[in-house]
Amino acid sequence: MKTILYSLLAAMMMIGCDNSVATKGFDSVDATRFAEVIENEQVLIIDTRTPAEFNEGHIPGAVNIDIDGEEFAAKVAELDKSRPVAVYCRGGRRSKEAAEHMVSCGLEVTELAEGILSWKGEVEK
């Protein structure tokens, strides 16, 4: 059953994204550089953790798009491709996966390499 669910999730992540287009990748940065990136008001900050993790504390201004949620791919496909995205999770694994998907969808992405665990700035609850 889990295999089927993971297969469906993988298929859904491909919807709306053109994987045949060469992408430039994404920047994986430390907390200091990430703080500089998100100072730009045009940057959309995305927290890829679960809603429960998000509610425990998140970077101010972040929106929650759970990478393990059913609607992750659909929500990413709806994002404004003209806005740069800054993405993070708890420790870096989920945000790297999300960043790869977002880049395949045509988004410009900066990823917080070691997640919110490395964040020294303000956290909002």
Name each model feature, range by range:
Residues 2-6, 15-37, 43, 52-84, ...:
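Rhodanese-like catalytic fold shared by cysteine-dependent sulfurtransferases
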